């Protein structure tokens, strides 16, 4: 069949037609354990019953009107997002790139400065602003010239950061765990130093929680575990559990810099997205739920260490909560292909890291099942090494 799609994705040939919880079924009836969650989107699993009910009920009332009118659902979701954290205002959009774009615009508008510092191997989006912020050349090839006034320093390198910080820096944007960059957690000392330097030079501290947010690491936002106080936090992906929605969350003091007409979104905060986000947050914010995520994260890391520590091609196992990276000594594309054949869907994070992003509702039994499937594949000698 001739495709009329731009070939912007390296698609696998399998096509899925049904999903439920942690499982998906392809068009041949084969069932898979999904440890991708749509790249960290379906944190509550596929077709979560109460999220589905909330969306279905909203579809019977009103889908979309305009942000020129009052929307009480937006207020409810904003309250859920800012509850128990030192952030006050929310701007709703449709994706992580849009949330980060809003953060960059707000930082420049509020500070009156233009220079933004991010990290090498970071990923912040594919719009011109967020692509310029991203610290990976492969994302930018062929699209230049990019926006000026973006600097990239090595992740977790305090010395390099200090060398570029000055009064001209509007903001520092960083991920608590670099997802696309290899599932690499930020050092606490690095995040603390960013906070200190931002205070010193009057810069905004922006945390990108597009992939780590909404419970992925065992707290609603990963930064909450680090004892830091950012000016802005961005989130998306799991906020709608598959319904497109993103959010930029900022301190009250930034509110006067985004006035009527200064920024906006046609679809951002629409009723259907807000219905999904409200239910997602009501489920994800439960302390018992978050505690289970922490426990499952510890459990799967322990099981992976036990089963893979003596496997020659395994170089490192790391992660935070249910965001796990298995670093290998060589490229992992063949492993991922073989795991798919075995019935386990996983992701890459760079050329040599297997990334696991299971739904947060995953059971210990399913985690064990995945670990043994991974062990089987990485220990199979006839798996080709690219």
UniProtKB/Swiss-Prot annotation:
Homodimer. Its EC number is 2.6.1.11. This is Acetylornithine aminotransferase. The modification N6-(pyridoxal phosphate)lysine is found at residue 237. It comes from the Bacteria. GO terms for molecular function: identical protein binding; N2-acetyl-L-ornithine:2-oxoglutarate 5-aminotransferase activity; pyridoxal phosphate binding. Binds 1 pyridoxal phosphate per subunit. Disulfide bonds: none annotated. The keyword S-adenosyl-L-methionine does not apply. It comes from Bacillus anthracis. HAMAP family: ArgD_aminotrans_3. The gene is argD.
């Amino acid at each position: 069949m001739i495709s009329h799609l731009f070939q912007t994705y390296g698609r696998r040939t399998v096509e899925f037609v049904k999903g439920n919880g942690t499982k998906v079924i392809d068009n041949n009836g084969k069932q898979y354990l999904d440890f991708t969650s749509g790249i960290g989107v379906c944190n509550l699993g596929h077709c979560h019953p109460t999220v589905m009910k909330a969306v279905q009920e909203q579809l019977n009332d009103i889908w979309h009107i305009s942000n020129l009118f009052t929307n009480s659902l937006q207020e409810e979701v904003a309250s859920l997002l800012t509850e128990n954290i030192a952030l006050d205002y929310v701007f709703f959009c449709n994706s992580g790139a849009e949330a980060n774009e809003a953060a960059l615009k707000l930082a420049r508008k509020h500070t009156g400065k233009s220079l933004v510092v991010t990290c090498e191997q970071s990923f912040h989006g594919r719009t011109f602003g967020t692509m310029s912020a991203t610290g990976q050349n492969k994302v930018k090839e062929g699209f230049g010239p990019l926006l000026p006034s973006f600097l990239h320093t090595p992740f977790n390198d305090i010395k390099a950061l200090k060398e570029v910080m000055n009064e001209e820096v509007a903001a520092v944007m960083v991920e608590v765990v670099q997802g696309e960059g290899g599932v690499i957690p930020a050092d606490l000392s690095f995040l603390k130093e960013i906070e200190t330097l931002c205070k010193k030079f009057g810069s905004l501290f922006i945390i990108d929680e597009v992939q780590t947010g909404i419970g992925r690491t065992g707290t609603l936002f990963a930064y909450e575990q680090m004892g830091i106080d950012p000016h802005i936090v961005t989130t998306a992906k799991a906020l709608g559990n598959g319904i497109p929605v993103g959010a930029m969350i900022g301190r009250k003091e930034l509110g006067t810099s985004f006035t009527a007409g200064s920024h906006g979104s046609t679809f951002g905060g629409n009723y259907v997205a807000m219905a999904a986000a409200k239910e997602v947050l009501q489920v994800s914010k439960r302390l018992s739920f978050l505690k289970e995520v922490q426990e499952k994260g510890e459990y799967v890391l322990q099981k992976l260490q036990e089963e893979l520590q003596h496997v020659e091609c395994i170089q490192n196992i790391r992660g935070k909560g249910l965001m796990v990276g298995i670093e290998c000594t060589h490229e992992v594309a063949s492993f991922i292909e073989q795991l798919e054949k075995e019935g386990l869907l996983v992701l890459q994070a760079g050329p040599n890291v297997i990334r696991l992003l299971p739904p947060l509702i995953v059971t210990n039994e399913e985690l064990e099942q995945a670990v043994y499937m991974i062990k089987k594949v990485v220990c199979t000698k006839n798996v080709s090494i690219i």
